[in-house]
Amino acid sequence: HDITESATNPTFDDFQGYSGNGTSSYLIIDYNPATDADNLALDDASFGIYFITAPSGTHPGYGNGVYESDAGSRLWINPARSADLERGYINNASVIERTFTGSVGLVTLTRTGSTTAYAMVNKVLGTVSEVESVAVPSGDIYLCAANIDGNPGGYHTGEISFVFAGKGLTEAQIADIYDCFDAYMTAIGN
């Protein structure tokens, strides 16, 4: 899908990715998980973002993704924060959390059933959550901010290299994505 930059363009760094300014810049991804998803389903989904840098501060409202309040559902990843706590939502309204050491890397949320979801940071699995799925949220995914009922919010300064959404991935598949990107970044000297 296409990336449509907002009127207040985020910064793009070659071989790194996009970052917002924390107040007004963000990306609109021309991808609505409720209508464009060939493989993403209510109880079979993964959503991942690779963060090159984390935003400053510990604001819990930072976001990337989409929130549809009428459906009570989010497909949303908070960027890593100094509190070493990753938070996100995958077709649900209750938070899924994973504590970890560090503040950058691949953050992936996966749902494999109506009450089975988990977060991974890089290749480390978090506790499996029993948060129940409610709906696949409708609205384009935003990065460097979140789409909250069609409006940007939760702006942040974290730098994002890539994002993916689709069918639920296994732990091994997520580890393969991480290893491939890590090898690429090492090969180009980053």
Protein language model regions, located:
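Polar, enzyme-active/binding microenvironments
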Residues: 1-190
